[in-house]
């Protein structure tokens, strides 16, 4: 029985991968005077922390100041591109109805995201997340977490639910693996990367969905 739900955010509740790619493209043009290739994107950018991406683009010559500056600039571009594309600037279909269903069932839920605080604040304000969950319970990249496993464990503590009794909703292979390693055995995958067959074979995965209407 599910006693708590932990959502990843980017690619799970909000489809935004193209905005991240566009933002890194803008930074790449500043740093290297060229765009990112598809090969680079898959090898050096997808699922990689900002710091490592910036080091890659600076040929491992980036200072701490460089990393801080360009990381913040990338996220600023990202938020700008999100706001400019109003047609896609919304949560995945069925999200709010699923939140309401969980509320009605008195099942607590929160978010565990690798996003930085500025982006979390942006999401809370833009999507009115404070109406649905305690903002203080949202887990984000505050610089203290070693990995997403630690984030999931902390999110379960915030909900006051054993992680074995939590449902985790993810969208990436690494996120699914981290959820399983954290102790979760009930993982739902949002198929934003169109990789259903592979996800269905992964340990802990109980369902693969395209949007949250499938859970209502």
Segments (PLM) and residue ranges:
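Asp-based, Mg2+/Mn2+-dependent phosphohydrolase catalytic module
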Residues: 1-3, 117, 122-216
């Amino acid at each position: 029985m599910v006693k708590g739900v932990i959502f990843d955010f980017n690619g799970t509740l909000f489809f935004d991968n193209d905005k991240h790619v566009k933002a890194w493209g803008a930074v790449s043009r500043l740093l290297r005077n060229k765009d990112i290739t598809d090969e680079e994107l898959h090898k050096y950018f997808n699922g990689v922390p900002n710091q490592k991406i910036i080091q890659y683009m600076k040929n491992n010559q980036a200072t701490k100041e460089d990393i801080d500056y360009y990381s913040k600039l990338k996220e600023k571009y990202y938020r700008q591109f999100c706001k400019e594309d109003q047609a896609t600037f919304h949560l995945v279909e069925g999200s709010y109805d699923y939140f309401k269903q969980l509320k009605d069932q008195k099942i607590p839920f929160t978010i565990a995201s690798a996003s930085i605080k500025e982006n979390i604040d942006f999401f809370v304000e833009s999507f009115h997340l404070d109406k649905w969950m305690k903002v203080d319970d949202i887990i984000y990249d505050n610089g203290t977490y070693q990995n997403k496993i630690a984030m999931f464990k902390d999110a379960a503590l915030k909900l006051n639910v054993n992680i074995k009794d939590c449902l985790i909703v993810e969208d990436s292979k690494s996120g699914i693996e981290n959820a399983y390693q954290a102790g979760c055995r009930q993982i739902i995958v949002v198929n934003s990367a169109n990789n259903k067959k592979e996800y269905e074979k992964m340990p802990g995965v109980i369902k693969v969905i395209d949007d949250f209407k499938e859970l209502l």
